[in-house]
Amino acid sequence: MALWGGRFKQEADAKFKFFNDSLRFDYRLALQDIDGSIGWAKAITSVGILTEQEHQQLVVALKELRAEIEPNIAIILRDDAEDIHSWVESKLIEKVGDLGKKLHTGRSRNDQVAVDMKMWCKVQAVVLQERIRNLQHKLVETAEANQNAVMPGYTHLQRAQPITFAHWCMAYYEMLERDFSRLSDAYKRMHTCPLGSGALAGTAYSIDRDALAQDLGFSIGTRNSLDSVSDRDHVLELLSTASISMVHLSRFAEDLIFFNSGESAFLELSDRVTSGSSLMPQKKNPDACELIRGKSGRVFGALSGLLTTLKGLPLAYNKDMQEDKEGIFDAMETWQACLEIGALVLEDINVNVERTREAAQQGYSNATELADYLVAKGIPFREAHHIVGEAVVYAISKREPLEALSVAEFKQFHPVIDEDVYPILSLESCLEKRSAKGGVNPERVREAIEAAKVNLGA
């Protein structure tokens, strides 16, 4: 039976009922709905709506219901209730009879769903931080194992300067650290409890909303009932953080796809995270990484969709807000899966250090070192930049790397260039010179790895 049937003389059309009902997706809020109901039972007992005996009966029944569904909440989908609130109430009435009908006193589904969603978002934030930490651990482990893997760094997808695979890993560690921080910030703003706001104007019963908030794991009750039932900022913040993180994961995946390709051959992905072709027997496709890259779009879409849904809504609750759920449920599941698969990809990754070094020695990625060499000889950088550009053009014409040019050839471009130029053109010198904080100098990279391990508690 619908929770609102008294006003209506006709049954809802079956098509409208399916269109309107939300149990098929909001069943995911079952545990939060039950926990919120336990908290609400205590609150209305404190103002005399329930006796202590009735309160205990309801709590026992609600806890029984929670225990029944917790192993597999999808069993709820066998029923045909309008939404998760209706389902919980109907099951409660089955257990305790008419007493179950008293629980909703002073409460609206508007503040009920608001608290359910916020509680669910809090759980998700914690779970996702755990998944981020796991991927960060894998990145640090991979970095530590590949500190000597010199490879080209890229700008515009052209070889730019030598880096190490460890430095590359730590770049993504830093991106994920910001994602972790954004979740922490979002979580702080989830500390207020909307339950007790009623439909929009507040509850008619003088419950202690701050005590209720603390019972449900919040810090304090919200300050404005109208805002409380209308607020979905916590959903938007999670979707925004997920979208930014999926940008990072997509770039991570794209880099690995490129490094794994036959054209680069910098590394090989494990058989455990790749698949074959139904036609071409030789193929080993980086499907795990391609799916991470591809799934970013659905997360971005969830954020865009909810922003569009909310932007024109008048206060307070509108049924449009039911559209907050499917997007966030899917986005959080997708984000979590991508973090988990990203960690799995790194478990058995095999870096070809000979190939990465060979590639780093190509593409004139030591040209900047030659410019810095000239600067050290007293030549202004802009002039040095031009001189080295000419030297690179000359080396390209000879199909030789810069370090293969003779001193006499170098002196065509400037007389200050001498025998001491060759040591600075080595890959090791290129790395060593980048010794400022955050640079690719091996010692700086080691320090970054150690700092990350401390941060992760490793």
From Swiss-Prot:
It comes from the Bacteria. The keyword Cytoplasm applies. It catalyses: 2-(N(omega)-L-arginino)succinate = fumarate + L-arginine. Its EC number is 4.3.2.1. One of its GO terms (cellular component) is cytosol. GO terms for biological process: arginine biosynthetic process via ornithine; L-arginine biosynthetic process. CDD domains: Argininosuccinate_lyase. It is an enzyme of class 4 (lyase). GO terms for molecular function: argininosuccinate lyase activity. This is Argininosuccinate lyase. It comes from Actinobacillus pleuropneumoniae serotype 7 (strain AP76). The lineage of its organism: Bacteria, Pseudomonadati, Pseudomonadota, Gammaproteobacteria, Pasteurellales. The gene is argH.
